[in-house]
Amino acid sequence: MSTNGTLSKPEFPANAASKEYAASLDAADPFAGFREKFIIPSKANIASTKLAKPGLSSEPCIYFCGNSLGIQPKATQKYLEAQLDTWSSIGVCGHFTKIEDSPLKEWQNLAEQAAESMSKIVGAAPEEVAAMGTLTMNLHLLLASFFKPTATKRKILMDWKAFPSDHYAIESHLAWHHLDPKETMVLIGPDEGTYEIPTEKILSYIDQHADEAALILLPGIQYYTGQLFDIPKITEYAHSRGLIVGWDLAHAYANVPLKLHDWDVDFAAWCTYKYGNAGPGAMAGLFVHEKHGQVDYSEGEDAPKFRHRLTGWYGGDKSVRFKMDNKFKPIPGAGGYQISNPSAIDLACLCAALSVFDETSIAELRKKSVLMTAYLEYLLLKDTTDESRQFQIITPSDPAARGAQLSLLLKPGLLHKVAHRLQEAGIICDKREPGVVRVAPVPLYNTFTEIWMFVQQLKAALEG
């Protein structure tokens, strides 16, 4: 079983390259109404350097950058105002007082409100998810708990082009254990001249290093190429060879269906500001499988046994959290990995974003996403050849091996010119050195007509 099962690639009729056809797809879109739940930046505002209120310009930009930062849900202002009103009106009482007409729980239970909604997105029990921290911080906490090198098993396997923060985190944990990263960090990359890492190659690396590797950490979706890895197959195989398995789901969360519990993933972490739309630097999430989150009181209430982790008071069970007796009794599950009192303001933004997902499911959103990305690919490749195109799509063509993003590797020297031309045309997408434009139509708020318009502008920029 692959991460998303077998997906048939959509096929398009002869008139699919017309704007009218794109409009017909929009007319039939069951998610069209969700676009109204978001504030789309305007062309005028993205060209301005002054603080502006949304809605002052009626012409929206084309925002294909949800793989870097999602746009603001309209619910965010409502949730933030409710939180600020609670703080201003009752102060510290907000920790325990449930406000009847607020969309938010009291502060002591607010992280659980977010975790419950996130658990549906990642395919986990609510107790296996915690809303806390930021992505790299959470990876550090998880690695501190799960990376237990021995004299023989001390290597960590990861992908060759991991997001730099992941790379730094792994290096620092190896150094923390007095290990040389040059000897103990194993990078798995594609074959020369290619960009996709075949699942079989990952499995072969696991075989090659199984006797010396303690842990493997991979991205659910590779941030640069957009490749979606076969999470269940890799996890099952790594477990069979004795490795702990962790996943960085920064680009998979709220993008593709996940079943972390059923896939027996040991731990995972993700940010919520990309496809999750929770805001820049928003509070992140982590997953710890229930088998690792158990608390054993068989030797008495004062001698709980649990998986070692770095601890803080907010990971303590609520029944003893305020006793101040310095006897740590962790919350069972991922909640026991919490450290400090989380920001209620940040949680308000996260809960606002999650309220949109509570109205649908990732499985349903995925259907539209597969169609959108396939349509983008179709328009990009139509009436061109590998020789005539000034770009190469380095994202896998198989819908089951990618999410919303297509990564376009431009010919040398084109990146900055093309990115500038696109922004002048009111199109926001992400560029990554040395030459990649990452384009991510998001099913919650993007349209097929926008995809058609983007391709016209990209072709003009490449020809100009």
From Swiss-Prot:
InterPro entries: Aminotrans_V_dom, Kynureninase, PyrdxlP-dep_Trfase, PyrdxlP-dep_Trfase_major, PyrdxlP-dep_Trfase_small. Keywords: Cytoplasm, Hydrolase, Pyridine nucleotide biosynthesis, Pyridoxal phosphate. It is found in: Cytoplasm. Pfam families: Aminotran_5, KYNU_C. The modification N6-(pyridoxal phosphate)lysine is found at residue 274. It catalyses: L-kynurenine + H2O = anthranilate + L-alanine + H(+); 3-hydroxy-L-kynurenine + H2O = 3-hydroxyanthranilate + L-alanine + H(+). It is an enzyme of class 3 (hydrolase). Its main location: cytoplasm. Pathway: Amino-acid degradation; L-kynurenine degradation; L-alanine and anthranilate from L-kynurenine: step 1/1; Cofactor biosynthesis; NAD(+) biosynthesis; quinolinate from L-kynurenine: step 2/3. GO terms for molecular function: kynureninase activity; pyridoxal phosphate binding. GO terms for cellular component: cytoplasm. Coiled coil: none annotated. Pyridoxal 5'-phosphate binds at residues 135-136, 163-166, 248, 251, 273, 313, 341. One of its GO terms (biological process) is quinolinate biosynthetic process. Its EC number is 3.7.1.3. Homodimer. Catalyzes the cleavage of L-kynurenine (L-Kyn) and L-3-hydroxykynurenine (L-3OHKyn) into anthranilic acid (AA) and 3-hydroxyanthranilic acid (3-OHAA), respectively. Belongs to the kynureninase family. This is Kynureninase 2. The gene is bna5-2.
